[in-house]
Each structure stands twice: as C-alpha cells, then as structure tokens.
C-alpha cells in the first residue's frame, strides 16, 4: 500500500521542515501540529468532518512521538474511550441482528468485529497508519510484515496473525475522537465504524479458533490431544500431540499464544489431509462447553 499524498512527515523530518519554513533551527523537542491538508485527508478516509480538528492530531499521536523530550498529549485517553464505545455499539448491533442467538455466540461475534486483528485490518485497509505520528524504531517494519501476511487470510486469521497493537489502538482512538466530537453520539460512531469495518464478520463468516476446532475434531474422531507449551520459554516452540504422536509444531518468538494457535492449525490440517477431509460440522454443545474451559492465552 502506497503512502497517500497527504501523509504526515516523519518525526525525524520535522526539524528540517521547521528550519526551511522559519530560517532557523527548531527548538528542542519541537513538535509541529498536523497541517490542514493532513487533517482533511484523515477526515476523508473516515467519512467524518471534525468540529474540533485538534482531536484528529491527538488521536494519531503515539507516546513515542515526543521522545526523548517531555511527553505531550497522546492518543491513550481517546483509545480508552473508543474501546468502550466500540464494544457498546457492536454489542447492540449483533444483539439486534441475531434475535435468537444466545450470549456465548453473541460474545464471539462481537469479539471478532472489535478484536486487535479486525481493527488492525481497518487501519491498513484505509491507510490510517500512514498518518500515525511516532518514533518507534521497528513499528513501520512490523506494519509492513502484517500487511504482507493479510493476503493469506482474507477475512480473519482466527488467532494465527499477530498484528501490531498500535494499529488497533489508532482505530480505537479515532473512534473515541469521533465520539467526543459528535457530543457522544453512538449512532454517528456506528455509522462511521460500519463503513470502515465493511464487511463486518457475520455469523456465516465467523471462523473457528484453531484450538477449539482441533479439540472438536479429535473428540469426533476419538483421538487424544495434548498441547505441549511448557518448553516455549526455552525454544519458542509449541507442539501438538495426537495419541502421543507429534502431529503439529510451530515456532513464534513474540507470543506463546500465536505459536500455540499455529501448532493447532498445523495439526488440524495434517489430520484432515490424512482423512481426506476439508471441513468439520458446527461445534456441538458438549464440545463447546469443554472448549470454554480451554486456556487460549498460551499461558
């Protein structure tokens, strides 16, 4: 994805820009505001025009942006607010859309539409990451890696990808900014988010978590399954044993949970290939109850 024409200059470029404009060195720690063109570009991407333009800048400013000088205003407060209001408006939407659905499936459906991966997808699909103000040295590379991996999972990876948290944060902070600017109007927030997140994950497109699907598959085929993650701290690897035999393995250094999910997916793919099977039936109530007791955090 190419940077849009109004993307903000990097933090390292800003002192030289100041010098060009003012014929003198920028004061230590100087951070120029976003220009009107940048703000307008963000508003265009969001489909919302702010009354208080300063909220746009606040929503896009990462804590690293002021390093090594004293901290300024960052997106953290707006992120907190946006997280809460997104949970509320999406909860309302799935509740009204699926009138007969029980709390368990409703919770999974809501989570799929507001989790870190879904919101990170929103950020990169609309190019919001180009306007992020930060000085985190490895962040741009992490975002690029995430974008390259997205093509493997058109809708959602269900726990197989590890998106940079800042992408999720910036969507939440912008939603929080819209909520504030609209005088706390949840309907406006929903209208904006619905367009940004299109297509929303529906009951028909809601995927299964690889660990839950693995346990369901093994129960149906009368196999014993064990996920071995005790050695992750030493070798960054998680293994899946089926009837005592190692069937799936995955290594991921950053998070044990991702290694666990990828190992479960590898084991599941191998089992299905062995049986010539591509899909499983919907999760039974008995298996669903057992799955709810499984630790999916990788701890």
From Swiss-Prot:
<feature type="binding site">
    <location>
        <position position="172"/>
    </location>
    <ligand>
        <name>Mg(2+)</name>
    </ligand>
</feature>
<dbReference type="Pfam" id="PF00035">
    <property type="entry name" value="dsrm"/>
</dbReference>
<feature type="binding site">
    <location>
        <position position="79"/>
    </location>
    <ligand>
        <name>Mg(2+)</name>
    </ligand>
</feature>
<keyword id="KW-0540">Nuclease</keyword>
<keyword id="KW-0460">Magnesium</keyword>
<feature type="compositionally biased region" description="Polar residues">
    <location>
        <begin position="275"/>
        <end position="291"/>
    </location>
</feature>
<dbReference type="GO" id="GO:0005634">
    <property type="term" value="C:nucleus"/>
</dbReference>
<feature type="region of interest" description="Disordered">
    <location>
        <begin position="274"/>
        <end position="299"/>
    </location>
</feature>
<dbReference type="InterPro" id="IPR014720">
    <property type="entry name" value="dsRBD_dom"/>
</dbReference>
<comment type="function">
    <text>Cleaves double-stranded RNA (dsRNA).</text>
</comment>
<feature type="site" description="Important for activity">
    <location>
        <position position="165"/>
    </location>
</feature>
<keyword id="KW-0255">Endonuclease</keyword>
<feature type="domain" description="RNase III">
    <location>
        <begin position="39"/>
        <end position="183"/>
    </location>
</feature>
<keyword id="KW-0694">RNA-binding</keyword>
<dbReference type="GO" id="GO:0005737">
    <property type="term" value="C:cytoplasm"/>
</dbReference>
<dbReference type="Pfam" id="PF00636">
    <property type="entry name" value="Ribonuclease_3"/>
</dbReference>
<dbReference type="InterPro" id="IPR000999">
    <property type="entry name" value="RNase_III_dom"/>
</dbReference>
<dbReference type="GO" id="GO:0046872">
    <property type="term" value="F:metal ion binding"/>
</dbReference>
<protein>
    <recommendedName>
        <fullName>Ribonuclease 3-like protein 3</fullName>
        <ecNumber>3.1.26.-</ecNumber>
    </recommendedName>
</protein>
<dbReference type="GO" id="GO:0030422">
    <property type="term" value="P:siRNA processing"/>
</dbReference>
<keyword id="KW-0464">Manganese</keyword>
<dbReference type="GO" id="GO:0003723">
    <property type="term" value="F:RNA binding"/>
</dbReference>
<keyword id="KW-0378">Hydrolase</keyword>
<dbReference type="InterPro" id="IPR036389">
    <property type="entry name" value="RNase_III_sf"/>
</dbReference>
<dbReference type="GO" id="GO:0004525">
    <property type="term" value="F:ribonuclease III activity"/>
</dbReference>
<feature type="binding site">
    <location>
        <position position="169"/>
    </location>
    <ligand>
        <name>Mg(2+)</name>
    </ligand>
</feature>
<keyword id="KW-0479">Metal-binding</keyword>
<feature type="domain" description="DRBM">
    <location>
        <begin position="209"/>
        <end position="273"/>
    </location>
</feature>
């Amino acid at each position: 994805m190419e940077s849009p024409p109004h993307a903000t200059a990097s933090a390292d470029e800003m002192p030289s820009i100041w010098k060009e404009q003012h014929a003198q060195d920028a004061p230590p720690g100087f951070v120029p505001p976003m220009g009107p063109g940048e703000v307008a570009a963000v508003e265009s991407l969001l489909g919302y025009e702010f009354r208080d333009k300063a909220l746009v800048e606040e929503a896009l400013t990462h804590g690293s942006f002021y390093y090594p000088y004293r901290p300024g205003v960052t997106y953290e407060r707006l992120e907190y607010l946006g997280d809460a209001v997104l949970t509320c408006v999406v909860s309302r939407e799935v509740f009204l859309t699926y009138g007969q659905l029980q709390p368990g499936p409703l919770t999974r459906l809501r989570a799929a539409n507001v989790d870190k991966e879904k919101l990170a997808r929103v950020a990169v699909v609309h190019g919001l990451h180009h306007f992020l103000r930060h000085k985190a040295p490895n962040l741009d590379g992490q975002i690029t890696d995430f974008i390259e991996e997205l093509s493997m999972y058109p809708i959602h990876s269900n726990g197989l990808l590890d998106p940079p948290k800042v992408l999720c944060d910036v969507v939440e902070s912008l939603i929080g900014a819209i909520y504030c600017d609209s005088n706390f109007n949840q309907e406006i927030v929903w209208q904006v988010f619905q367009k940004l997140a299109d297509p929303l994950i529906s009951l028909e497109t809601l995927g299964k978590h690889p660990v839950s699907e693995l346990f369901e598959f093994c129960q149906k085929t009368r196999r014993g399954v064990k996920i071995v993650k005790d050695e992750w701290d030493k070798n960054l690897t998680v293994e899946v044993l089926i009837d005592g035999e190692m069937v799936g393995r995955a290594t991921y250094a950053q998070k044990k949970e991702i290694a666990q999910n990828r190992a479960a997916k590898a084991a599941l793919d191998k089992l299905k290939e062995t049986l010539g099977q591509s899909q499983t039936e919907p999760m039974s109530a008995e298996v669903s109850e057992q799955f709810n007791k499984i630790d999916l955090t990788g701890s």
